[in-house]
Amino acid sequence: MNKYIVLNIVLFSFLNIHQIQGQQELNFNHYMLNSQLFNPAFVGLEENLTISSISNLQWLGFEGNPETNSIFLDAKLKNNLGIGMELISDKIGPTSSNFIGINAAYHLKLNKNSHRLSLGIKLSGNDHNISLNSMSFDDITDPNVRTKDSYFITNIGFGLRYYTDKLYLSFSIPYFFEPKTINKKRHYYLSGGFKKELNDKLLINPNFLIKKASNTPTSIDVSTMLFYEDLFWFGINYGASGNGFISPNGSGGNLSFISGFKLIPALSIGYSVTSQIGNWTGSTNSRSHEIYIKFRTSKKLVKSSNESLPENKVNGDPNLLLKKRN
């Protein structure tokens, strides 16, 4: 009897986690350095082909802790077109998700003063799985224990991005359809930021990201990054949902510290650690760790021209779009 009670509790808990996971999108601390995850209009802004990776580990020390690994490709094509691809593996307990997304964008020049509008589209497929095979029970012959369910979901998304050499503002719906099998809600994203050169070597870059879905609290991330030339950077990000953004002690939020440096001209590495604050404060095991790696190849799919997009000079971050210094 106790075995079935425990099994029901485990099933109920992880199914609810799976449902919550289906409702909520992935959230990376390095969103300002790699934004095609939530907006396809960000691809194709750099001259060189780039390959980047983000790995996020949460609740270290707990069995079945959330783990997300991702790889992103970004390339500029002819005629102000850009293309990108994302591969993401996400695991939590007995649930897993393998995602592939193809992003394409067209960058429209609005005037001669570097005002531009990007239009993006995303096509994606996501394989969701929930399996208790990896869990240990006394009676392994019980057919209820060997439970596995799988769904493959296709979707489409859209994005807009307005930007100059000083600021940007974007809006996107990365997954338009709302599949009922995993109770996934349509999310709306609004992001923006600006850059200001403090002197010849230092640049400050505040950013924000607002995420909203029906019948869920609004999620807000606010970050400030400080860049020293093209060599290293550090910053801080605060995120919370609902009233937690205004009153962290009321419903909890998270605080992240971000840093990174350029190892060689073509390779950048970043790291961030996130701690829960407010009612979610716990042990050090509840912290999340994230590693960011970006490799900018020497490969250019198109030749540079006077009509090309402004070249970004800080770690390949398309949000900044710094002007070249003499």
Predicted regions and their residues:
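Short amphipathic alpha-helical "recognition" segments used for binding
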Residues: 6-7, 266
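Serine/threonine-rich low-complexity intrinsically disordered regions
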Residues: 1-2, 16, 317
